[in-house]
């Protein structure tokens, strides 16, 4: 079985690693260079996209911001999973919000903005504070503004106006500000015949809009809510593959914040913490194979490595620590890799996070230090 991944970053890399034991060969399309490359070595392979489409059995995607002509070309082959519709919804907040409404899953109240009058109407309808998000191209906290006070309206509008003028296809989604208790996410998979499996919820900690720490949690009531919402969205799309839903938890109730039609950063913990990791289950789903068990096998936390290309030796020396590097050139704030920390029980996992806080730099790993201070104030 041969799979073409649209995108050639770390998610394609980890899909390739997960596919090898199943005798699934992966190649990747680098959207920037428009080359077909090997996902691990980045070696350029000697054929173009159209030839690659003909030579593979399945096409999938590692991220949602793929040019629509490329998605449409792949969709015409009948080999693209998830569908172009699903991938496009993940890359456009207007489509995403419409999808959530059709699926009848709870999400923050919103309206669309293209003009100063639209902003005035949005403030009257939703009230302040509000969060303003770009419809296209926003991820990891980019393309977002927070409007808290009436005195900010003109200055924020000036920024929005410049942003909109630079891209005629752009729009702004105005959402009510949600005072959430915590952020959680659910990663699951749906296959060609409609079977669904979901992993345990993960509690997520973000730093400046970027995921820093993700921990698998046992929350039965929330898990039931999240699974029902996952199924509603997946069935609305007739989805095939791994799908992630990010939620705000507010007094025991969940609101969908975003969807990601792909394997997801908050699911990386499954590589060591679940019986079948998200990358393998994605390939199983899109290749027509039975889905694997999502059972938790060890208490697990995932720590993103941001902007660092080296770690202290003590990290690998700690029992239950697994490091995954992405092979990227070092750049400030860039996702360079992640650490999966596993333990037999939650208290042991907390102890290990505290140990890691003693050797990891607080500036680079603020979430680990914050958790350690909560555990051992």
UniProtKB/Swiss-Prot annotation:
Uppermost EC category: ligase
Catalytic activity: 5-amino-1-(5-phospho-beta-D-ribosyl)imidazole + hydrogencarbonate + ATP = 5-carboxyamino-1-(5-phospho-D-ribosyl)imidazole + ADP + phosphate + 2 H(+)
Pathway linked to the protein: Purine metabolism; IMP biosynthesis via de novo pathway; 5-amino-1-(5-phospho-D-ribosyl)imidazole-4-carboxylate from 5-amino-1-(5-phospho-D-ribosyl)imidazole (N5-CAIR route): step 1/2
EC assignment: 6.3.4.18
A GO cellular-component term linked to this record: cytosol
Homology family: Belongs to the PurK/PurT family.
HAMAP family assigned: PurK (MF_01928)
Name this polypeptide is given: N5-carboxyaminoimidazole ribonucleotide synthase
Lineage: Bacteria, Pseudomonadati, Pseudomonadota, Gammaproteobacteria, Vibrionales
